[in-house]
Amino acid sequence: MKNARFLSSLVATVATLSLLAPSFASAERLNKTIETLAAGQAAFGIFSGDRSLSNARSLSRSELDYILIDMEHGPYDVETLQTFLLGMTNKAEIKATNSLAMNTTPIVRLPTNGREMNQYLVKQVLDMGVFGVLFPMINTREEAENAIASMRFPRAAGETDDGPQGLRGRSPGTAVWYWGTGYSEYLSKADVWPLDPQGELLAVIQIETQEAIGNLEAIITTPGVGAIFIGPSDLSADIGLPRSHPTVEAAIQTILASCIKHNVPCGITTSPNDIAERTKQGFRFATVGGDSGISPRTERALNIGRETAGRD
């Protein structure tokens, strides 16, 4: 009953924000993680499979830049995703800042691997209002291009760029009121950065296999890729060696070097023990925790990362 009242209140609040959208600066950046990365800074987040309202509220008030909502190793459930996103709506923050920009950016990791060339799951999570998608197991440029295309609306006649033509169908009503924009404004903002410098969607490509490393340059230079994320556990499993083995670390450094070369933010999972080193190496999209939420361990890693990156 309490949850029902809470959801009713949040739905009414976000719907009202959509009506009040013109009072906010239309040129403001809604995706603060993109704002951080575009400034050349490091962004820090966590993986989370806990889609409870209490966890959403806690994470939205934290100093985390983003949350990777894990629907790969957790259930793919759009309804619980919608509840979680509503729980991240911080009315006090909106009032205090007079800004629709969320303090912590929600990004979804999908359950499908790149070779499955999926599109409809991307459309569903974007239609709920998320600001980014993490695509696991991308091994080729073709798979990366499909990922980017699935996030984009088709271009209008006469509009061209270097990226793949959009494949996303138009029915973003929920996302429109969640973002607090008008329909036309949403369509103009809901494109991938940095291909569209004003785009508010972040496409994160996960590199987890030797095949992907063999196609690294082609994947990283795919127009529309906003960040690369290394999956060290699956990468080590694919190589057939422990995660701590020098060969695995050499593969990680190969990926990082290519990202730095092409000025594409690179991410990896970390802990308080290695976040400072990874940040110094050049990782700019590191996670600092998991489903324990903002535990003392996660908070310690976050603080170390922010201090090392010069963000405190």
Predicted regions and their residues:
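Expand to "…catalyze enediolate/carbanion chemistry for C-C bond making/breaking, isomerization
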Residues: 14, 24-312
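Bacterial N-terminal signal peptides
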Residues: 10-22
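Bacterial N-terminal signal peptides that target proteins for export
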Residues: 1-12
